[in-house]
C-alpha cells in the first residue's frame, strides 16, 4: 500500500472522555504504524497523541466549557467580532451545540490549513456537521459516531412506562 498524507478534522478531541478523541488517537496511531503521514486539525480539548502525529490546534471559542451565560458572554466579548462569531454566540445562547457546525469555518481560517490543504490525499472528518470548501469535499470521508436520533430511540425503547 502506498503512503497517504491524511488530514483528520475534529472539532474537539478529548483524550479521556467520550469516544471522539479516543477513536481519533487509536485510528491515527494505527495509520502511522502503517507508514501513513497523519496530521490532526483539532479544536480544544486536544488529543493526546505521540510526536509522530502532527497536531495543529484550530482556534475555537470554548463556549461549551461552561454553561454560565455570563462566562460565555465574557468569552464572546474577547473575540474579534466577525459574522461567524455573532452567529456562533447567538446560537449557543439558545442551547444549540455549535462546535461541530462552525468548525469548518474556523478551520479555513487556520494558517497551516490554508497553506497545506492542497497537499493532503484525503480528509477524514471526525463527527463534524460542517460545510467544507471544495478542496476538502472532493477527498472527504466522514465518521458519525452515534447519530443522536438513534441514541434517543434506544433510550425510549429501554424506558419503563411513565404510568
Where are these regions (language model features)?
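Short amphipathic alpha-helical segments and helix-helix/interface helices
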Residues: 25-29, 112, 132-134, 156, ...
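Aromatic-acidic/polar surface patches that form glycan- and anion
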Residues: 16-20, 93-96, 100, 163
Amino acid at each position: 500500500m502506498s503512503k497517504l498524507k491524511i488530514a483528520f478534522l475534529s472539532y474537539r478531541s478529548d483524550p479521556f472522555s467520550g469516544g471522539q478523541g479516543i477513536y481519533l488517537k487509536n485510528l491515527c496511531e494505527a495509520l502511522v504504524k502503517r507508514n501513513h503521514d497523519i496530521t490532526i486539525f483539532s479544536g480544544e480539548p486536544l488529543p493526546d497523541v505521540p510526536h509522530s502525529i502532527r497536531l495543529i490546534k484550530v482556534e475555537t471559542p470554548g463556549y461549551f466549557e461552561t454553561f454560565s451565560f455570563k462566562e460565555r458572554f465574557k468569552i464572546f466579548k474577547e473575540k474579534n467580532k466577525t459574522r461567524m462569531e455573532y452567529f456562533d454566540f447567538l446560537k449557543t445562547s439558545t442551547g444549540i451545540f455549535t462546535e461541530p457546525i462552525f468548525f469548518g469555518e474556523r478551520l479555513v481560517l487556520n494558517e497551516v490549513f490554508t497553506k497545506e490543504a492542497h497537499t493532503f490525499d484525503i480528509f477524514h472528518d471526525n463527527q463534524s456537521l460542517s460545510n467544507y470548501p471544495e478542496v476538502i469535499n472532493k477527498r472527504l470521508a466522514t465518521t458519525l459516531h452515534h447519530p443522536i436520533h438513534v441514541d434517543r430511540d434506544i433510550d425510549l425503547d429501554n424506558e419503563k412506562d411513565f404510568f
